[in-house]
């Protein structure tokens, strides 16, 4: 498509948290609907508006469901209630993607939207029962909760003076995937080990440290790998 990309306007509060306004009509998000995309080996990462706005959301969901067996899928649910106009359709699409995913990253706010009648941990277990090998729950500066069929654990979030939270979730996911890709080239770290609680926690730790750097500076400015401690990579 030659249509422009979707526009998001972020407004920062005094504590660095962001609120967003999205401009989607007349953009590529409303036009992409073909089946000519190709997903190679490695990882596929999606979520947020990509699973909210049809027709592109339906197309992306199919990419996740029909990806090659060697391709891992990380889904950052990142609900956008303000632009969800068909909640039943959205939930059905999301449930299908969750069932096909390997790792789900979800915030406490996402869980409140999806399961308003449940507390966060019960809701997270509900997601895990839906099919993924691991669920990672973020809640701002609170410890990250990790759930796999083996059990659960927490990853502490180091203190940081927050400047700008734009891109924090994407940076977390990038750190998670980068750790997994790095380790998979040197050891037996693959899809079957995504249920290993210690390994998932180690990958989440890399994600946490990456996102802490990102929120400590202005703009969506994730760190380079050399900015992270070498100890994170094992």
Residue positions per predicted region:
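Short, hinge-like loop/turn segments at secondary-structure boundaries
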Residues: 13-16, 90-94, 122-124, 151-155
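Solvent-exposed, charged/polar functional surfaces in cytosolic regulatory/catalytic domains
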Residues: 19, 66, 210
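Conserved N-terminal subdomain of the carbohydrate kinase-like
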Residues: 1-48, 53, 230-234
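Glycine-rich beta-alpha junction loops
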Residues: 2, 26, 79-81, 110, ...
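Acidic, amphipathic alpha-helical patches
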Residues: 35, 94, 162
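Conserved beta-alpha-beta core of the PfkB/ribokinase-like small-molecule kinase fold
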Residues: 43, 49-125, 132, 142-143
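Short gly/ser/thr-rich secondary-structure transition/capping motifs
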Residues: 24-33, 83-89, 192-193
């Amino acid at each position: 498509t030659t249509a422009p990309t979707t526009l998001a306007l972020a407004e920062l509060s005094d504590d660095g948290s962001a609120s967003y306004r999205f401009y989607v009509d007349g953009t590529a998000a409303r036009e992409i609907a073909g089946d000519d995309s190709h997903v190679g080996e490695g990882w596929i990462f999606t979520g947020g508006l990509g699973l909210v706005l049809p027709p592109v959301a339906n197309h992306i969901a199919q990419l996740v469901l029909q990806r090659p067996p060697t391709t891992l899928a990380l889904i950052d649910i990142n609900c956008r209630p303000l632009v969800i106009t068909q909640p039943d359709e959205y939930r059905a699409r999301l449930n299908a993607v969750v069932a096909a995913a390997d790792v789900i990253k979800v915030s406490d706010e996402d869980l409140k939207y999806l399961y308003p009648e449940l507390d966060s941990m019960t809701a997270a277990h509900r997601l895990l029962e839906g099919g993924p090998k691991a669920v990672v729950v973020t809640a701002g500066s609170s410890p990250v909760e990790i759930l796999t069929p083996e059990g659960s654990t927490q990853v502490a979030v180091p203190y940081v003076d927050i400047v700008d939270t734009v891109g924090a979730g994407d940076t977390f996911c990038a750190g998670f995937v980068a750790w997994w890709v790095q380790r998979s080239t040197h050891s037996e770290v693959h899809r079957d080990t995504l249920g290993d609680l210690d390994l998932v926690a180690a990958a989440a730790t890399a994600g946490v440290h990456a996102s802490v750097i990102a929120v400590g500076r202005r703009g969506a400015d994730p760190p380079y790998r050399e900015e992270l401690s070498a100890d994170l990579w094992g």
